Amino acid sequence: MASVLLSDLSNSAYMKLALAHPGERPEVSTLYPCKSIEEFNGSVVDFLDAHDNPDLLGAAVSACGWEVEGGFSMPNHGYRMERKDLRELLNIQRLHIVNDCVSRAMAVERLFDSEVIKVCGGDGEDGLTKALIGSGRGLGVAGIVQDDLGNPTILPCEGGHADLATISPREASVFALLEARYGHVSRERVASINGLAEVYECLGRIDEGDTRRVNVAEVVALAHIGDARATEAISLCQGWLAAMASDTALMLGARSGVYLSGELLELIGELIDWKAFEARFTDKGRLTAYMQDIPVYLTRTADLELIGLTTLFR
């Protein structure tokens, strides 16, 4: 049986490659470098060589970016992938290139019970809209709308670039520093991997005049040993992420649930105060009861994007 090639470039440092039969999950994925289009092409060739160059029915790629005029621009990688070139490289006609958050949303209906954990909220209503929030290098959003036959349609969004709002003097002080640095302050500036490090740095400048730069691994490590600034940075970050999930649920009418995914949550999941998250998620004044009924889930699988890509070949 012919196979399909699956590739996920949602991480800027490497990509995942896997083979699967149509409609089936890949058994294993392998990490390969992809810092340039030449390195991407070489990695694909090496991967296929290592698997005896199987017959390919088609291929699917997920990446952070968007398609324009037959090419997929990937700002995190700094290069553009052309459809015609990839078709020629693989000797195929059937090729899908989708946004990584869209591929995650496509996976939601295929997840096993063990791959989803409910973190807060009520029971919701079956058969209505769902939403997926993907927080990693960026902040992505997608809607999942069922048709009359129960088949999902994915609504791609760019909600991570929506304006950031604040609800406390502390949040406002962080916002002011980010505004001075960037001008426009989007939600992605705070509710992402880089955003967590930025929030930590802002708190240091506000409280101690500390201007040193840090990476997110340092912040998480400090939080694990009880560092007050790191703990507060995660608290602020989770609050803004909860607000993002809440606003998305309202705007999409996601009564069937909100699904949280991404590298940020993999890093700080055990440090999140889910009670505080729920309080921020449901704090919508007259619509608090409406929000309290919406379930919020955390996805727990390493290859969410690849699972989503398999749905394109059912």
What is the meaning of each model-derived region?
Residues 1-2, 55-57, 93, 128-129, ...:
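Short coil/turn segments at beta-strand junctions that form active-site/ligand-binding loops
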Residues 8, 60-64, 98, 131-138, ...:
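Short beta-strand segments
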Residues 14, 66-68, 138-142, 198, ...:
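Short, acidic Gly/Pro/Ser/Thr-rich loop/turn segments
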Residues 33-36, 76-77, 96-103, 122-125, ...:
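Active-site nucleophile and cofactor-binding loops and adjacent substrate-binding regions
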Residues 51-97, 102, 106-115, 132, ...:
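Short beta-strand-loop/turn "lid" adjacent to the catalytic site in phosphate-handling enzymes
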Residues 94-125, 217-231, 235:
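ATP-dependent carbohydrate kinase catalytic cores
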Residues 115-187, 277-282, 286, 291:
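Glycine-rich phosphate-binding loop of actin/hexokinase-like ATP-binding domains
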